[in-house]
């Protein structure tokens, strides 16, 4: 499966433009360009009530979770709670995850899910959008940033102003670690997809990619001049350090690489690192 990067994102059915709505949480279903319903949550910034934080009402983080995550997972909510100290946060469950419709394509058509969430965030009145993705979500934010450019016709409401990719792969079909071999079994085997559905609440599409989408490392050169931060753990059990280094090399001068003392994705990222990411995004998003 692949996507047609042309075409617009279908908006949520909620009326989002009221300033009052930006002060209260919202939960709704968005509709992607290919008709999938996406469970989505808006959390207003906590510093509306917290005088110690700088005012940045126009900044919103759009968080893309990892494979088998969803908006209600505790590790996703912890990320949200930290980022609300720097701006509003939109989270969503990728297709095939949680209460969202469809089936997971493990990073291919998920760019449409992210585009719908970014468009919704802008519709709520936020003028600066930082996308932050973890693991599979980290690959999605990279591909999304390359496909949805500020100057491209039809994509001006779905582009990111800053991009943070945490624990992302650089290339597809990597099986060099035991966790990735297990993941490939989940995705490619009927028995694995049953385990994923009933054990991890993740419904995976049975079809192979056709054509194979552009890989993260192939996408990165198309992100410039949008600021890019690549974050990776030195103890990541899924993707070794050659992955972030490949991404950083592809980014050149417009990318920044942080190698951190941690493992993989949302479960491993600490509050101090999330604070630094929040600071970086607030500055980089302009």
Language-model regions, residue ranges each:
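The serine-hydrolase catalytic nucleophile loop
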Residues: 67-80
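Short beta-strand element of the alpha/beta-hydrolase
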Residues: 57-66
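Short beta-to-alpha linker loops that shape the active-site pocket of alpha/beta-hydrolase fold enzymes
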Residues: 67, 93-98, 169, 263
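The alpha/beta-hydrolase serine catalytic core
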Residues: 7, 13-18, 24-28, 38, ...
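Primarily recognizes the serine-hydrolase "nucleophile elbow" in alpha/beta-hydrolase
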Residues: 120-181
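A short loop-to-beta-strand scaffold at the N-terminal edge of the catalytic core in hydrolase folds
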Residues: 33-53
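Alpha/beta-hydrolase active-site loop
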Residues: 105-124
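Conserved alpha/beta-hydrolase
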Residues: 80-101
């Amino acid at each position: 499966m692949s996507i047609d990067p042309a075409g617009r994102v279908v908006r949520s059915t909620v009326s989002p433009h009221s300033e009052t709505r930006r002060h209260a949480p919202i939960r709704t279903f968005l509709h992607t360009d290919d008709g999938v319903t996406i469970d989505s949550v808006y959390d207003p910034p906590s510093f509306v009530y917290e005088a110690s934080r700088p005012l940045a009402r126009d900044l919103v983080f759009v968080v893309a979770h990892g494979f088998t995550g969803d908006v209600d997972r505790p590790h996703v909510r912890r990320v949200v709670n930290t980022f609300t100290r720097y701006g509003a946060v939109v989270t969503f469950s990728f297709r095939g995850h949680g209460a969202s419709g469809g089936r997971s394509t493990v990073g291919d058509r998920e760019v449409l899910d992210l585009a719908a969430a970014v468009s919704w965030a802008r519709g709520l009145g936020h003028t600066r959008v930082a996308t932050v993705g973890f693991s599979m979500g980290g690959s999605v934010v990279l591909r999304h940033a390359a496909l949805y450019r500020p100057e491209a016709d039809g994509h001006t409401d779905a582009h990111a102003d800053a991009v943070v990719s945490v624990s992302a792969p650089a290339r597809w079909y990597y099986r060099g670690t035991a966790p990735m071999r297990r993941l490939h079994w989940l995705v490619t085997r009927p028995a694995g997809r049953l385990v994923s559905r009933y054990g991890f609440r993740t419904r995976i599409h049975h079809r192979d990619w056709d054509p194979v989408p552009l890989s993260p490392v192939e996408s990165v050169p198309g992100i410039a001049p949008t600021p890019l931060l690549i974050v990776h753990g030195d103890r990541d059990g899924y993707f070794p350090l050659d992955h972030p280094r490949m991404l950083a090399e592809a980014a050149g001068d417009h990318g920044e690489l942080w190698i951190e003392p941690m493992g993989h994705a949302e479960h491993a990222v600490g509050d101090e690192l999330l604070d630094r990411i929040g600071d970086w995004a607030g500055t980089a998003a302009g």
